[in-house]
């Protein structure tokens, strides 16, 4: 029964994640003029789409790989590769999203990294990069000792949840900041809740719902991967023969 609830949660997460990306893309296409790669505001429009796709949806999916019951038995190698690959894909989307916003700022002569949103965002990306490279070095390569892996595993899990929480916070602050900027001198101000504001606010709520459900699945003790024992724990990926 627990497995059934888990897969139901996965279906809900898949739907919510897809809606987060599609809603963000529709907002940029319908209200903000679409997409381009020319340094203009149309290039900026890639930024929210790629950050939601990478730092929230793909990151959340990667975090849940070891919650799949099918990953609890048999060789661990495919699941480790999938976990790392999804995180790498998320990081790639994030880097392209950052390139889009920095090039737009350069083209429009806008200062970089001055808002709280940008500080939160860049902090999250730096933590994500450190988390990925540390995980690769410690849990993938064979040099690390069992003691070091045992020490860092809880920190790896903790910072994974922290990074997802920071990603959600960054997205919400970014949506709010964007609406304040674009509706500041509009015919209908933000305070009058025009259609764009309602849609973007709803997109933000979808992101929050997705993130909270991911965190719930991660924290649910009945859905955690069973401890395979000390012997398996000290085997690095490159020596996995299960």
UniProtKB/Swiss-Prot annotation:
Assigned GO CC terms: late endosome membrane; lysosomal membrane; lysosome; nucleolus
Places the protein is found: Late endosome membrane; Lysosome membrane
Cofactor: heme b
Cofactor binding: number and manner: Binds 2 heme b groups non-covalently.
Membrane-spanning intervals of the chain: 5-25, 41-61, 82-102, 120-140, 155-175, 203-223
Binding positions (heme b 2): 67, 83, 156, 224
Lumenal compartment spans: 26-40, 103-119, 176-202
Membrane topology: Multi-pass membrane protein
Outcome of swapping residue 117 to A: Loss of transmembrane ascorbate ferrireductase activity
Documented effect of changing residue 48 to A: No effect on transmembrane ascorbate ferrireductase activity
InterPro entries found in the cross-reference section: CYB561/CYBRD1-like (IPR043205), Cyt_b561/ferric_Rdtase_TM (IPR006593)
The reaction(s) this protein catalyses: Fe(3+)(out) + L-ascorbate(in) = monodehydro-L-ascorbate radical(in) + Fe(2+)(out) + H(+)
Result of altering residue 112 to A: Decreased transmembrane ascorbate ferrireductase activity
Task performed by this protein: Transmembrane reductase that uses ascorbate as an electron donor in the cytoplasm and transfers electrons across membranes to reduce iron cations Fe(3+) into Fe(2+) in the lumen of the late endosome and lysosome. Reduced iron can then be extruded from the late endosome and lysosome to the cytoplasm by divalent metal-specific transporters. It is therefore most probably involved in endosomal and lysosomal cellular iron homeostasis.
Assembly and oligomerization: Homodimer.
Protein name: Lysosomal membrane ascorbate-dependent ferrireductase CYB561A3
Gene name for this UniProt entry: Cyb561a3
């Amino acid at each position: 029964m627990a497995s059934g609830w888990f897969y139901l949660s996965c279906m809900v997460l898949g739907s919510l994640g897809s809606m987060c990306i599609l809603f963000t893309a529709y907002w940029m296409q319908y209200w903000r003029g679409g997409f381009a790669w020319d340094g203009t505001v149309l290039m900026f429009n890639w930024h929210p789409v790629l950050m939601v796709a990478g730092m929230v949806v793909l990151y959340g999916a990667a975090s849940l790989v070891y919650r799949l019951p099918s990953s609890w038995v048999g060789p661990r190698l495919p699941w480790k590769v999938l976990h790392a690959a999804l995180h790498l894909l998320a990081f790639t989307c994030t880097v392209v999203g950052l390139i889009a916003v920095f090039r737009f700022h350069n083209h429009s002569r806008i200062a970089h990294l001055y808002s709280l949103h940008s500080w939160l965002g860049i902090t999250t990306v730096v933590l994500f990069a450190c988390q990925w490279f540390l995980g690769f070095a410690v849990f993938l390569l064979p040099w690390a000792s069992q003691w070091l892996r045992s020490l860092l595993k809880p920190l790896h899990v903790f910072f994974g949840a922290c990074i997802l929480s920071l990603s959600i916070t960054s997205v919400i602050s970014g949506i709010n900041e964007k609406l304040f900027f674009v509706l500041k001198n509009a015919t209908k101000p933000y305070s009058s809740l025009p259609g764009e504001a309602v849609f973007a606010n709803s997109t933000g709520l979808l992101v929050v719902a997705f993130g909270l459900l991911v965190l719930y699945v991660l924290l649910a003790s009945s859905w955690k991967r069973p401890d395979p024992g000390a012997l398996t724990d000290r085997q690095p990926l490159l020596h996995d023969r299960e």
